[in-house]
């Protein structure tokens, strides 16, 4: 809220929309593989940062490798060579991946932050199926868990 105060604005004047990339599946390794190309694209953009959040300092070598290997033409390609550049730990730090319970728990914790809404980025491959699963299973599970 420091930026709001410095600008003389109230929190109610700003909409905070958290964009979430997520892969839900019973096979955790497959879910992580599903988010890896997107995570690599993020790592490539972090490479030039001079100041890094302390929790991400350990990923600097991955950011450098991603910057060298990432090609926009293969941005979310499931076959992109750059998808293997980043570690599982980094991929999990920028996206949600795992079974339904894991993703629902993380979404509920994110919703507790001072945000107004969550927008879900749809990954490549089977987007209609992903959207149907999100709207028919994931969101209702988050809503049901919120009532408990």
Report each predicted region and the residues it spans.
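Structural motif
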Residues: 113-115
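Glycine-/small-residue-rich active-site loops that bind phosphorylated ligands and cofactors
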Residues: 23, 125-126
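An alpha-helical appendage that flanks or caps ligand/catalytic pockets
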Residues: 1-109, 143-147
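C-terminal helical cap(s) of enzyme catalytic domains, especially alpha/beta-barrels
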Residues: 1, 127-147
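Short secondary-structure boundary segments
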Residues: 122
């Amino acid at each position: 809220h420091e930026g709001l105060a410095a600008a003389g604005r109230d929190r109610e004047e700003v909409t905070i929309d958290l964009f979430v990339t997520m892969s839900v599946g019973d096979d955790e390794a497959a879910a992580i593989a599903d988010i890896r190309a997107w995570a690599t694209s993020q790592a490539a953009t972090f490479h030039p940062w001079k100041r890094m959040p302390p929790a991400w300092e350990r990923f600097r070598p991955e950011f450098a490798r991603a910057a060298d290997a990432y090609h926009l033409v293969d941005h979310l390609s499931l076959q992109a060579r750059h998808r293997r550049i980043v570690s599982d730990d980094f991929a999990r730090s920028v996206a949600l991946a795992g079974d339904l319970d894991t993703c629902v728990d993380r979404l509920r914790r994110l919703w507790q932050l001072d945000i107004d809404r969550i927008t879900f980025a749809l990954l490549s491959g089977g987007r209609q199926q992903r959207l149907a699963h999100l709207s028919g299973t994931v969101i209702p599970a988050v809503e049901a868990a919120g009532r408990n």
